[in-house]
From Swiss-Prot:
Cu cation A1 binds at H161, C196, C200, M207. Its EC number is 7.1.1.9. Component of the cytochrome c oxidase, the last enzyme in the mitochondrial electron transport chain which drives oxidative phosphorylation. The respiratory chain contains 3 multisubunit complexes succinate dehydrogenase (complex II, CII), ubiquinol-cytochrome c oxidoreductase (cytochrome b-c1 complex, complex III, CIII) and cytochrome c oxidase (complex IV, CIV), that cooperate to transfer electrons derived from NADH and succinate to molecular oxygen, creating an electrochemical gradient over the inner membrane that drives transmembrane transport and the ATP synthase. It is an enzyme of class 7 (translocase). GO terms for cellular component: mitochondrial inner membrane; respiratory chain complex IV. The lineage of its organism: Eukaryota, Metazoa, Chordata, Craniata, Vertebrata. It is a multi-pass membrane protein. It comes from Cratogeomys bursarius. This is Cytochrome c oxidase subunit 2. The keyword Transmembrane helix applies. Its cofactor is Cu cation. Mg(2+) binds at E198.
Amino acid sequence: MAYPMQLGLQDATSPIMEELTDFHDHTLMIVFLISTLVLYIISMMLTTKLTHTSTMDAQEVETIWTVLPAVILVMIALPSLRILYMMDEINDPYLTVKTMGHQWYWSYEYTDYEDLMFDSYMIATSDLKPGEFRLLEVDNRVVLPMELPIRMLVSSEDVLHSWAVPSLGLKTDAIPGRLNQATLVSSRPGLFYGQCSEICGANHSFMPIVLEMVPLKQFESWASSMT
């Protein structure tokens, strides 16, 4: 999860988030090189006394600054399209969980189990236990098996919401009347926090998400105790 004064991305917990982190670094390096080149050219233009008053055109330069940006855009677009495909693809998910956004809480339904559904509300600051995080803890965590593909179906009962867990590379809009899909795979156990990422009203900031990723046997025991 995030910590105070953090400048970078959260530690990746899923293959998708690892790919997104690499793509971020790849794109950032390209932007850095372009910015450095532009600043260098501007500095040279401001400091040099040389002029080219007789130059009416420079086709070589025009060709370069047309072809080079096109090549750079391709270098950014290809890995981006690959990641978008990976985020949208899901084959034979082990589990499907339906997530519904409400003002201002989340409800979850494990569609592969009978009567396994619950609401998830934020725990008030006055009820927090030592070591728990303000505005991030919930009364019912979403328990899921690690290292297995999980399909999240996201929608809303009222207004626009957004179901987001940064460390897993997840951010899916919850739209009334529409069912969106996201793929979730956690590479390690633990608690992973998120929040509603779409302004949805007065208590938008009080819609946390907590995923508890556990080994498969522990998940099956939890599911049996809940049904």
